[in-house]
């Protein structure tokens, strides 16, 4: 097919007009995007961030310097000591001990003790990171709120908090949560013997903590008798409210009978692997009898095991009713422990926002 010169010119003009329209539309899109970007910058300005801040010039950095300048640290009964304990929920001496533990075992990571990182930027000091962890645990601050008082970024605060919780449990769980032996066990039994419960060394119960942001597809699995998704923990304490054993988190739909089967401490006591040689004397039908083994006080939702004594719910016997009232009046140690923890650390009192804060 042969085209004439006029046809060829007409086709070139049509192609040129199409190209010019495409270029014009592209220019219009650029102008519209520029206007939209300018509007976004005008309505939501981004504040410039100092990528190498001096953390010691922050409010909490000045606080650490001021308290460290006091010889021997602030006294617990002094104004500064009371103010520090009220704001960060622990005495200043305990805070110094935690800082020393973090430096010794590197709870905040391998580079936490260094002053500068590989890019020659100032690393946030361990003292300020420890204050941020205490504030999050004690007053349930958000991670972005920490930046206002420490000049520390939200990502750094989140990473420091999770590293501390994970590493602290790994290194120091056995140092604070351990099974009593010898003299300590005898002293614990003496306390309960004076209350009329020979052979008892503590009480156990389960704590259900609300999980607010539970996925919808897991609501039924994690919801129990409370009516909302929760995380269940089993805990055993003595009369002085020292924790003897605890478990990790379980589904909120599980009851106390199921959770206690996974408690290693209770299982060992039941199977006579620990405290099997401990003996005490009680009256059985008027005869003084020596019994071996120990037991714990619990509520009526547990198994009828010999190592777990609970009050009798339905009885017509006067002696059984008096025994149940006596046990109920002394079964307050584990409940008081939960109350003390919630009062000291507000992060335990409120709901659990994310599952990543479970250790």
Where are these regions (language model features)?
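Charged, often Cys/His-bearing segments associated with DNA-binding zinc-finger transcription factors
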Residues: 1-116, 170-173
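Short alpha-helical segments in extracytoplasmic peptidoglycan/chitin-binding modules
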Residues: 91, 132, 146
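Alpha-helix N-capping/helix-start residues
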Residues: 92, 126-127, 154
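Active-site-adjacent structural elements in folded domains
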Residues: 115-119, 129
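Extended, leucine-rich alpha-helical cores of fungal transcription factors
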Residues: 122-123
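Short, amphipathic alpha-helical "recognition" segments used to contact nucleic acids or chromatin
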Residues: 126-139
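Short, well-ordered secondary-structure "scaffold" segments embedded in the functional core
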Residues: 142-359
